[in-house]
Structure formats: C-alpha cells, structure tokens
Amino acid sequence: MSKTFKAIRDRTYSGVGDLIKLLPTGTVFLFQFLNPVLTNNGHCLLINKYLTGVLIVICAFSCCFTCFTDSYRTRDGYVHYGVATVKGLWPDSSSVDLSSKRLRVGDFVHAFFSLIVFSVISLLDANTVNCFYPGFGSAGKIFLMVLPPVIGVISGAVFTVFPSRRHGIGNPSDHSEDDASEMK
C-alpha cells in the first residue's frame, strides 16, 4: 500500500469516526459488524451486493426511525418508549402528560441529517466502495477524504441549531426533571 493511500484511508477513518457520534450506536455497530460479512470483505458477487443493499436500507431506516422515538417514566417508575406523533407519544399513557413530546420540525431535520450521515458512512466504507464501485479512481479517493468532514461540520451545525431533546430507544434520559413536571 502506498503512503498516499494510507494517509487518505486514515483521514477518512478519522472523519467517519467523528460522524458516527451523530448516529444511533446500535445501528452503526450492526452495519460495521455485518458489512464485512455481507460484502465478502469487498469482493462481491451479485448476491453480496443485494444483501449489502438491504442492510444499508434497513440501517438507514433505523437511523431515521430512532429520531422519532422517545421515552418517559410513569408514576410506578418504569421507563416506557413510544413514537412521536402530532398529539404526543404513541402508545399513550394515562399517568403522564405526553403532549410535550409531540412531533416537531427538528425531528424531521434530525432524521434527514441522520440519513445523510449514515449514507456517507455506509457508502464510503472501504468494503462497500470495493463492492459497489471498485474502479474508484484518484478523484474518488479525494472525494472519500473530503466528504466525511464536510458532512460532519454541516450536520454538527444543523444539530446545534436543532438540538434534540428526545431520548429514544436505547437512550433513556435521567427523567428527573422532565417527567416530574409531566405527571398529572
């Protein structure tokens, strides 16, 4: 391997590492665990391409869906999860006022940018690149190096403007102040 390729690879991994912080960790772990197996470490047959495509679609859906999930604690102390709707969380709870957890514009912004970030991570993964577009030239390698940090900066700025207060599946909050004020 040439020094240039190693430097590009290292910068790409560094940029991808920063982007991963913006996504659900379980989804990213699942992708990183299964992608080398499904792509045959980048040496794909047609079936490998289909299976990898399905994995990418499922993980992308998961990244978007988790932006619309939230959790709450009931009076009995149990944490429950739900999906944000226009009226609050579904399924509804009779012991907690969930109207403050209704759908917001920021949820759609987070879902869109989570999809963008996951797309960059999944489609620029070394195994995915070798599988789907093995003839990536030198211009493509520059693209691999530049795109993750650019998307990371843009997404980070957008996530700063639209902070998420959701504590979805796998991310329960401490619920100390939020749910105490929501009890009926």
UniProtKB/Swiss-Prot annotation:
The chain crosses the membrane at residues 19-39, 45-65, 105-125, 142-162. GO terms for cellular component: endoplasmic reticulum; endoplasmic reticulum membrane; plant-type vacuole membrane. Pfam families: DUF679. Expressed constitutively in leaves, stems, flowers, siliques and roots. Keywords: Endoplasmic reticulum, Membrane, Transmembrane, Transmembrane helix, Vacuole. It is a multi-pass membrane protein. InterPro entries: DMP. GO terms for biological process: abscission; endomembrane system organization. The keyword Endoplasmic reticulum applies. It is found in: Endoplasmic reticulum membrane; Vacuole membrane. Involved in membrane remodeling. Belongs to the plant DMP1 protein family. This is Protein DMP2. It comes from Arabidopsis thaliana. The gene is DMP2.
